[in-house]
Amino acid sequence: MYKIALSSTGKVIDEKLFESFKEAGIHAIEISGLFEDHMNYDMGHIKKAADKFGVKLWSYHLPFKPFDIIDLSKRELCKNSVKIMGELIKRAGDYGIDKYIVHSSGIIKRDELSQDEFHDRMECSKESLAALAEIAHRAGGNVCVENLPPKCIPTKVDEVRELLSADDRLRVCVDTNHMLPGNPVDFIKGLADKLVTVHISDYDLINERHWMPGQGVVNWQEVYNGLKEVNYSGLWLYEIGYKSNGRIYSPKDFVQNANDIFENKKLGVYGIEQ
């Protein structure tokens, strides 16, 4: 069984949030949000509130949009993107966060790119990631490359591997609802040596959905057992808002869902109708 964590996406980060985490048995949080949220987060206040209720600041999801401002794969945007992300990494590192989740590109029309254009996108991402890896190292942590949906880079295990080749200090975050097509277990096993954190959510194989496990098509016993087989030592971190797919959830619902998966129980209906 893994300790349970939640992303802050779709949530107000305040003392009430951390108090509810403690009451439910949520071990940690990933700091995430919109671009303007990142610019305005008071990390000192967040750290103080988290410490008060014994909640660990596990990871920091760097902003990935607006796409006309942030894109590590686009020549005209990559330098400023690295600058923005670099400052956020330094700030997060100052408060003990050591895993920085990154999207290696914005939305791109892959089917409209020539081979040379795609290659340049990959090379630009690699250069950007190498720069961020150095900043993260100085901050005491690692940049974690996330697998992404088909309109982005990277979408395949070999593409993630290619990006990781930019710097040996790069690590991986596997998102279980970004394989279109694909199987989360293939990514877990194919990237096991670099895997340090996950984003847990379900989907329908049509688009990313960020649903509660049990609402989609993911085989959660395969995912759980796959993580154990590769000796994954991180957390079971949900990237799901409190309002998702017609349901409203509380921290206790996520804990119940996780425990049902860990104990190989039939997944039920969690939360209340929206």
Could you describe each region identified by the protein language model?
Residues 66-72, 108-115, 206-211, 244-248:
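A short acidic, helix-capping loop that chelates divalent metal ions and anchors anionic groups
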Residues 28, 59, 144-145, 173-174, ...:
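Generic enzyme active-site microenvironment
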Residues 7-11, 32-36, 62-65, 105-107, ...:
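Active-site beta-loop-alpha junctions enriched in small/polar residues
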Residues 1-3, 12-22, 97-98, 130, ...:
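Histidine-acidic metal/acid-base catalytic patches
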Residues 42-53, 127-135, 187-190, 222-226:
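Catalytic-core regions built around general acid/base machinery
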Residues 27-28, 56, 98, 142, ...:
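Residue-level detector of anion-binding/catalytic polar loops
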Residues 1-94, 193, 256-274:
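N-terminal pre-domain/capping segments
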Residues 15, 52, 71-171, 273:
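Active-site acidic/histidine proton-transfer and metal-coordination neighborhood
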